[in-house]
Regions:
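Short, basic, low-complexity termini and linkers enriched in Ser/Thr/Gly/Pro
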Residues: 2-30
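C-terminal motif of bacterial Sec signal peptides marking the signal peptidase cleavage site
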Residues: 32-35
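A sequence/structural signal for flexible, mid-protein segments enriched
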Residues: 37-283
Length: 283
């Protein structure tokens, strides 16, 4: 069964992926440094048609996308759901019923508050789904650049994202890079091994000399998105990285038996225009 996440503010167009495999074992060290994923469809290891709830509370608004996946032997597209009742409450006493817009999308203009734990309830056709997530504090992007790095005899272009770890608290991060408004690379990161210090995430972009769709072109617009997420959201997306190895779906993020996730997060963005002449070479 396949589904892809929506192209709204959370922008988690996260798909089932294969790891970026290098041609030589010497490249494994670079792979371990980057730990980023390409944008490929999620191939769910389930057969029945299930509801899919993709929802978020952010520093700008609340929203959800609700659909129903199709059986694996059904060639039709997934169906958007327009008759759900979606309510998000906070432990600060807030309550918002999201209003249906179109294409299975529900929204409310309320913003998330750091430290507040939010609960979403979704009622649709006699089924009930719930999930909780705690809003995190605002992250900051220090810098982003593209570098060239030689591995064995070949050159690779790599995205380098730097940001300070938020002090005096446990932190989990989600990073998503868009290329010309389409998902390009993503990664998750925690701070358990080096809390409170500058963090760096590397993204495998492409091997120089390749001609495939991954290759960046002069003038490509990159949008770098950095999210602070809670542990339950981190665990969900980290488990997605393990799908090929375990042969299972991501760990459940909702009660009630639906697919998908609910995330309360703070998002910051930075724009970057790719120019080959500006790519810096590093040892």
């Amino acid at each position: 069964m396949k589904y892809s996440l929506p192209h709204y503010h959370l922008s988690f167009i996260i798909y089932h992926f294969s790891l970026f495999i290098f041609h030589y074992s010497l490249f494994i060290s670079l792979l371990l440094l980057t730990s980023c994923e390409k944008e490929i469809e999620i191939d769910y290891h389930t057969v029945p048609s299930l509801y899919v709830v993709e929802a978020s509370v952010s520093n700008t608004r609340m929203e959800a996308r609700i659909s129903r996946s199709q059986n694996m032997d059904d060639n039709s597209t997934k169906s958007d759901i327009s008759n759900a009742v979606v309510v998000i409450t906070g432990d600060d006493g807030s309550s918002n019923q999201l209003k249906y817009q179109s294409n299975g999308r529900y929204t409310a203009n309320s913003k998330g508050v750091p430290g507040v734990t939010y609960t979403i309830t979704v009622d649709v056709n006699d089924e009930h789904f719930t999930s909780t997530s705690t809003m995190q504090n605002k992250p900051t992007i220090s810098s982003f650049r593209v570098i060239r790095k030689k591995i064995a005899t070949e050159w690779f272009q790599i995205g380098e994202l730097n940001f300070p770890d938020l002090p005096n608290e446990d932190n989990w991060y989600f990073m998503h890079i868009y290329r010309n408004d389409l998902g390009y690379r993503w990664a998750v990161l925690d701070d358990r091994n080096d809390p409170g210090n500058e963090r760096q995430q590397l993204f495998n972009f492409f091997r120089e000399g390749d001609t495939g769709s991954d290759v960046l072109r002069d003038g490509d617009n990159l949008r770098i998105e950095l999210y602070t997420i809670d542990k339950s959201t981190y665990d969900y997306f980290f488990s997605m990285q393990m799908m090929d190895n375990t042969g299972t779906n991501p760990i459940p993020n909702f009660t009630g038996g639906c697919l998908g996730y609910f995330s309360a997060h703070w998002l910051v963005t930075q724009n970057f225009v790719y120019r080959a002449e500006n790519v810096e070479e590093e040892e």
